[in-house]
Regions:
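Acidic, proline/glycine-rich low-complexity intrinsically disordered segments
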Residues: 1-325, 330, 345
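Generic structural signal of hydrophobic/aromatic residues within well-ordered alpha-helices
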Residues: 122-125, 335, 365
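Short, charge-rich, low-complexity interaction segments located
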Residues: 328-332, 336-342
């Protein structure tokens, strides 16, 4: 509290306490409790010293200033060992409702910090020789490769996640990551689900594990179970983007695309730099399509294609949406691309009807593709 107003001490402490509570819900973060972190309050201490004394890799520090009915909160995330800034932000707010402002700043800070730490940890792991990695480092290397979405990177991600499990069979992240990799391969749904169930069994309070299980259940056609697991994840960690994403796609494929859209939009808003953004945009396109909002489906699919031109699924939704809009020539071009980018994916998604597709949604997609020129 740098405002000079003793009354703002409670406001500053409230924000700090709420951020500690919110961050502690993220399964990938180890967060020091209030009593220990508050022991540094008001002291001019070196961030490296704080890191050593608390045994943490990152330190979040901030300040509060008040002028009239306005308050300014600044926050910065620092890597304790090096003193390098990982993230910083400033929030200026009117104090009409002090608790609303406290909640708003807490949420804004929390949803920014978790992805920033994830990025920093992946970069840190990539700088280390593979042979020197512990389970956490192997997991982070796996996550880095997983985000690239190429066949080669998927193979490397699988190896690093398996190594994380071998190094620490009780480490939930290894099972979550390996399940995620297997979701990209054919004929692996049962193992994908088993790994996700193992993660949940190891830690029933891990929101990321429940989110992964939701997607594995959806891949097997269990729409109700998928929604239930995603909702459980959100109950544990309301700001976890992956949980909103899992719920969104599960709802979209369950005949509730409007509700699915709201969850998917929340997911993208919470983590706009998500390495899985192409999946989110593709899911946004299909949810809009199922809502019969074909213009919005085209927009979402084109956004995905601009960022990830080698990802096949958005071309399929683009072709179907353009077909429904009667934009035949554009639809034919998109259809050709959907087939040529990945013939196997097109065959699986279109001709075979994967388990996550209910007959009614699948027929709806086929109608659009036929209008785009697909002859079956």
């Amino acid at each position: 509290n740098m405002s000079g107003d003793p009354e703002q001490e409670f406001f500053a402490d409230g924000i700090a306490e709420d951020i500690i509570t919110a961050l502690s819900r993220y399964p990938s973060l180890f967060v020091i409790a209030r009593n220990s972190s508050f022991s540094f309050k008001g002291r001019a201490v070196d961030v490296k010293q704080v890191g050593r004394e608390l045994g943490v890799r990152y330190v979040l520090e901030g300040s509060l200033r008040k002028s009239g009915n306005r308050v300014r909160v600044t926050a910065q995330l620092v890597e304790a060992e090096t003193g390098n800034h990982v993230w910083a932000e400033r929030y200026d707010r009117y104090l009409a409702d002090i608790f609303a402002v406290q909640d708003e700043i807490t949420q804004a800070t929390t949803i920014a910090i978790a992805p920033a730490i994830a990025d920093a940890e992946q970069q840190r792991a990539m700088r280390k020789p593979p042979a020197s990695l512990d389970a956490w480092g192997a997991y982070q290397r796996g996550m880095w490769h997983l985000s690239k979405a190429s066949a080669e990177d998927n193979g490397l991600a699988e190896k690093f996640f398996q190594r994380a499990i071998d190094l620490d069979p009780m480490f939930v992240g290894g099972y979550v990551g390996l399940s995620a990799v297997l979701s990209r391969a054919k004929g692996t749904q049962s193992r994908e689900e088993a790994l996700a169930r193992r993660a949940v069994a190891l830690d029933g309070g891990d929101a990321e594990a429940h989110s992964r299980l939701a997607l594995a259940l959806l891949a097997g056609g269990d729409h109700q179970g998928a929604c239930a697991q995603a909702e459980r994840a959100l109950a544990i960690c309301p700001n976890l983007a992956a949980a909103h994403g899992a719920l969104g796609v599960a709802l979209a494929y369950s005949g509730r695309p409007t509700d699915g859209l709201a969850a998917l939009e929340a997911c993208i808003r919470l983590d706009p730099r998500d390495p899985s953004l192409v999946n989110r945009l593709n899911q946004l396109a299909l949810a809009h399509y199922f809502c019969h909002d074909y213009e919005a489906a085209v927009e979402a699919a084109e956004r995905a294609i601009r960022s990830f031109p080698d990802f096949p699924s958005p071309y399929r939704w683009l072709a179907a949406a353009l077909g429904e809009l009667g934009r035949t020539e554009e639809a034919k071009t998109a259809l050709e691309k959907a087939i040529t980018v990945s013939p196997d994916s097109f065959d699986f998604q279109v001709r075979q009807r994967p388990p996550w597709f209910r007959p009614e949604e699948h027929s709806h997609m086929l109608d659009g593709l036929k209008k785009a020129g697909w002859e079956g």
